From Swiss-Prot:
GO biological process, one term: translation
Record-level Gene Ontology MF annotations: rRNA binding; structural constituent of ribosome; tRNA binding
Gene giving rise to this polypeptide: rpsL
Listed CDD domains: Ribosomal_S12
Organism field: Streptococcus pyogenes serotype M12 (strain MGAS2096)
HAMAP family: Ribosomal_uS12_B
Name of the protein in its database record: Small ribosomal subunit protein uS12
Organism lineage string: Bacteria, Bacillati, Bacillota, Bacilli, Lactobacillales
InterPro entries: NA-bd_OB-fold, Ribosomal_uS12, Ribosomal_uS12_bac
Length: 147
């Protein structure tokens, strides 16, 4: 434990909070050609490379990723979620924060259905099971076995 005199000479430093997605906290002034402190929830970018990579040790797969040059001139690696995608080089994409735990260096996700990225094809929403025997063509949800 430090003495009062030691704390007077050298005060305690507060912890610096590190961002999980630092590229989203930087803007770019193209007129002055300088980076600015302008945070954003998403950023637009151009895919410079689209490919697959293998995950860390216990998992095994081919995860799809894209290398993206953002509008603030920072280049990041972003994960392409969902089954199948239509991204190519020079596709304009929207990225959001959020890492992929088993892919080292991937701290961003591409937003499906925004800009050049198509949504996931043939994706079905889960049907809530209410415990009733309802026929498929019975659209109003009236019970079948009522008399």
């Amino acid at each position: 434990m430090p003495t009062i005199n030691q704390l007077v000479r050298k005060p305690r430093k507060s912890k610096i909070e590190k961002s999980d997605s630092p590229a989203l906290n930087i803007g770019y002034n193209s007129h002055k050609k300088v980076q600015t402190k302008m945070a954003a929830p998403q950023k637009r970018g151009v895919a410079t490379r689209v490919g697959t990579m293998t995950p860390k040790k216990p998992n095994s797969a081919l995860r799809k990723f894209a290398r993206v040059r953002l509008s603030n001139l920072i280049e990041v690696t972003a994960y392409i979620p969902g089954i199948g995608h239509n991204l190519q080089e020079h596709s304009v994409v929207l990225i959001r924060g959020g890492r992929v735990k088993d892919l080292p260096g991937v701290r961003y996700h591409i937003v499906r259905g925004a800009l050049d990225t198509a949504g996931v094809a043939d994706r079905n929403k889960a049907v809530l099971n209410t415990g009733r025997n309802v026929q498929k063509d019975n659209r109003r949800g009236i019970r079948e076995n009522e008399s």
